[in-house]
């Protein structure tokens, strides 16, 4: 099977689902169809009812060109399921992109991933670098999936909306953490 379909697999902790819902919205803006995305917190992107999760995922990894997006956080590294996903993607030599969720730092990256690969830090204080890395990711996905380019003004608006959502979610999570202490 030479021309395998391109698919995105988002590996994240269920505790970080809000971030990933916003990220899927950004992917759809780029032109990725929801049937090309696996993200279990988004109804149109989740694993079909009645399927064995691990069998379904194994088939996806074998039958598709998978690009994994890791949503790294402390929650990620506390989840056996996400660490299993990381191992499976490593064994299959999948292309991957790392998102560092707010509050997570590069020094905490661990596991079988290449720690020298540049990731996107979603709370990077250098907003120019953050926007540049998101644009590079967009361009890579457009090329990889054979998508049409998005209007630059529309992209900037949707990207900024995404970054604002990330900020709001992070602030909400900070409040939840503070109030539970």
Give the role of each language-model region.
Residues 15-18, 77:
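Short alpha-helical
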Residues 6, 33-35, 63-67, 92-97, ...:
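Short glycine-/polar-rich loops that comprise or flank the Walker A/P-loop
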Residues 1-9, 17-25, 29, 103-181:
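C-terminal interaction surface of TIR/SEFIR-family domains
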